[in-house]
Amino acid sequence: DVNSLDPDFGLPFSDRFALAFDFDLEDNMFFGVEYNKDSVDRAFAYIDPNLEGNVAGTLPDGRTYYSNSEGDLHTTFTDLGQTTSWSYKFTKSWFDNKLKLYLAYSDTEAEDVFAAGSSTQGSNYGKYATCNNQFYPNLCTKPSLWGASERYVGTLDYTADIFGADNPTRFYLYWLRESGRPFSFT
């Protein structure tokens, strides 16, 4: 197995922008909105030079699959991939902050070429689903593995003085709902 590196390869980086507005409302209420944008300038991409010409067939979803490779990988880079997200949060408290409610929603659109969640070329290339172009990775992106497109969060927090004011007791409820499935098949 040979792992080669593009001679022009550099460390991955991206441009990021964030803008947030927070509003203190009346009656112990708070509202916030945030926008985040992340654009890839350089990210990992992998090419398996031994797959060229070794097309074995087509998968039911239209992607090409290849016969076994020799295990040689060439690491290069891509400028494709981006993340855009909006998030909203609301808090309200009652009874001198003894009862608190927190609600939040986020909407994220994230695309990347390779997930790059491992420490070696082979596992980054072989573990994660990729675009359907192993020879020209700069031509395609796919939904990212790392971001849930929608997320809802809620908490309810109550502080009681069951054992006196010096030893407060907290009751805490937490709720989370994310889009997607806990497992996927690729």
PLM regions and their residue ranges:
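Outer-membrane beta-barrel translocator domains and adjoining extracellular loop/strand segments
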Residues: 44-50, 113-120, 184-186
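Conserved small-residue
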Residues: 153, 157-186
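Hydrophobic, lipid-facing positions within transmembrane beta-strands of outer-membrane proteins
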Residues: 5, 15-19, 82-88, 150-156
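Transmembrane beta-barrel strands of outer-membrane/channel proteins
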Residues: 33-37, 103-107, 158, 171-177
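Residue-level signature of outer-membrane beta-barrel architecture
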Residues: 23, 92-94, 158-160
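Short loop/turn motifs that connect adjacent beta-strands in outer-membrane beta-barrel proteins
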Residues: 28, 94-98, 161-168
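Extracellular loop and loop/strand-boundary signature of outer-membrane beta-barrel proteins
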Residues: 4-7, 71-77, 85, 137-143
